[in-house]
Amino acid sequence: MKNDLRIRFRCDGVLGVYKTIDKKLASAFTNRIKILGRADIAERRHHQDGHMTFEDTSTGRNIDIRVSIYITVYGEKIVLRLLRKTQLVPLDQINMFPRTLSRFYEDALDLPSGIILITGPTGTGKTTTLYSAVNYLNSIDRCVTTAEDPVEFIIEGIAQCSLNSKIDLTFETTLPYIMRQDPDIIVLGEIRDRFSAEAAIQAALTGHKVLTTFHTEDTTGALLRLMNMNIETFMIASTVVAVLAQRLLRR
């Protein structure tokens, strides 16, 4: 805002104002968050991402926080995303409809190969479901390799790669190396463009299981977006085994 610094919280999907403070405090406020989030406090012209860990003294839990800094006409806008850092939520506790969960196991996760797309708007729990599915598939006789931007949950026993464009560790440079790691299951944090979509298709065609997320409103939208990326329809039909679209319901 032009004259004030507004603090808002999103609870159960509803964004509301918590407090409005004097704009004079904005610089000190943002600099402190930048320091905690390991961002560059001198950089005010470009968008940045950061990461911090906060200890909740009342419960003794560590809370993982992703920091997003966005440059606006009135200064820097900061969004903090809280991540659950405790043990992963088992799939049967995510509260899917029983029939949906049963089909997700039988028609997707238990198949030997193919692409599994988890879709939905931002903030609908796609990442939580993705990690729960990966944790379900994780076993001593399977090689699971990931490319994520960034790694949000650590799962013991799998090879997780956190991408970093600053050192040229991108999807483009990482995906060829994944195929040399003898993976049974490949996890891509998100399909963002035609390159990552084609990489997922090629991996599935060679007998791998691929799990990833996609920003679309529904299941049909996921397939249409793949087609808009100029992926041939017969390639989509022969590799995509499941599309799971989800929403979060308010308590």
Where are these regions (language model features)?
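Short, flexible helix-loop junctions that flank or precede catalytic/ligand sites
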Residues: 1-251
